[in-house]
C-alpha cells in the first residue's frame, strides 16, 4: 500500500510540473501585440533569442536580436499599425515548440489605410531560465508586391 501511495504521489507531482507551453506562447504573443501596437520595437526584440532569425516576405534573413529590433523599428516608423495574432496550433518537442498561426494588421501609411493578413510559423526555444523565446519566424502576406 505504501508503494502504491508513493507511486501515486510521484505521478501526481510529475504531472503538476508539465508546462502549458501553448498558454505561454499565447501570453508571449499578447506581449508581442502590445509592444507592436504601442510602437515598442525593443520590447518585440526582447521576445527573441540573441541569435534569432526572422524571414519576412520578399526580404533577406534578419539575424540577431539587434537587427530584428531595427527591422521592427523601421516597420513601426513606416505607419501607425494595429497587429492581431491568432495561434492555430502549438506542437512541443523538448526544448522547442512549433507554432502556426494567422495574423492581421492595419496600418496607415502616408494617409492611406493598408490591411494585410497572412499565416506564420514560429519556432520557440526554451531558455535556461525557463522563458520561451522566438528562435525562428517566417510569415507570408496577402499584399501583392510589384517589382
What are these regions (language model features)?
Residues 90-97, 112, 125-131:
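A short, structured loop/turn motif at beta-sheet edges
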Residues 16-18:
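Bacterial signal peptide processing site
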Residues 117-143:
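Short beta-strand edge/turn micro-motifs at domain boundaries
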Residues 31-32:
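Generic hydrophobic alpha-helical segments
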Residues 4-13:
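Sec-dependent N-terminal signal peptides
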Residues 101-107:
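Generic short beta-strand segments
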Residues 22-28, 41-95, 102, 114-115:
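A solvent-exposed, acidic/Ser-Thr-rich amphipathic alpha-helical stretch
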Amino acid at each position: 500500500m505504501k508503494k502504491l501511495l508513493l507511486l501515486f504521489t510521484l505521478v501526481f507531482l510529475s504531472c503538476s510540473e508539465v508546462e502549458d507551453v501553448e498558454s505561454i506562447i499565447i501570453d508571449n504573443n499578447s506581449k508581442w501585440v502590445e509592444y507592436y501596437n504601442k510602437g515598442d520595437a525593443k520590447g518585440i526584440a526582447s521576445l527573441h533569442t540573441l541569435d534569432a532569425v526572422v524571414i519576412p516576405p520578399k526580404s533577406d534573413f534578419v539575424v540577431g536580436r539587434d537587427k530584428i529590433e531595427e527591422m521592427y523599428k523601421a516597420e513601426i516608423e513606416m505607419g501607425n499599425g494595429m497587429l492581431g495574432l491568432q495561434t492555430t496550433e502549438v506542437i512541443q518537442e523538448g526544448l522547442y515548440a512549433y507554432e502556426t498561426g494567422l495574423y492581421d494588421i492595419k496600418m496607415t501609411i502616408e494617409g492611406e489605410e493598408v490591411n494585410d493578413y497572412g499565416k506564420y510559423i514560429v519556432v520557440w526555444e526554451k531558455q535556461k531560465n525557463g522563458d520561451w523565446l522566438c528562435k525562428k519566424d517566417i510569415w507570408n502576406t496577402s499584399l501583392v508586391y510589384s517589382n
